[in-house]
Amino acid sequence: MAQLYYKYGTMNSGKTIEILKVAHNYEEQGKPVVIMTSALDTRDEFGVVSSRIGMRREAVPISDDMDIFSYIQNLPQKPYCVLIDECQFLSKKNVYDLARVVDDLDVPVMAFGLKNDFQNNLFEGSKHLLLLADKIDEIKTICQYCSKKATMVLRTENGKPVYEGDQIQIGGNETYIPVCRKHYFNPDI
């Protein structure tokens, strides 16, 4: 029986590399997968998942109004698994579509992304995945300052912490730092 998996972690926790690893494992056995990512993620290239260690792969971009269920249902070959990167940017509708892929098409879905933003609020996609997922797992990494478990994301601008602004600002290591709670409130900058 297929399940909806939500795997979350802070920045630099290896979420995308995990997607690429899972895809490779399925495909090594001749089992096709579908890799999708939010259309908002344009860090490297539109419609591409890319890890910080340099591995990359084409992906189907997901817009807020995309009918993911119909897209998967109408593929010429049923996938063995659907892998989603940057799931925090998904809309409520997108997440409910993913649940239908699992329940109605019996295709497992693994969604990877951030849980909370730089202000410590849940993203829309994360909120609905926490509500609907059958299995929820944390992908761990360490605080940049003290090596304790990182649970938050610190946004920086010109070397200074930022606690206000738009929820979504696409960026990488130059903008966001994985931190523990202590260093979120008192960063060593």
UniProtKB/Swiss-Prot annotation:
Could you name the active-site residues? E86 (proton acceptor)
Task: Respond yes or no to whether keyword Cytoplasm is given for this record.
Answer: yes
Q: What is its EC number?
A: 2.7.1.21
Q: Keywords assigned by UniProt?
A: ATP-binding, Cytoplasm, DNA synthesis, Kinase, Metal-binding, Nucleotide-binding, Transferase, Zinc
Where does this polypeptide localize? Cytoplasm
GO molecular function annotations of the record = ATP binding; thymidine kinase activity; zinc ion binding
Supply the name of the protein. Thymidine kinase
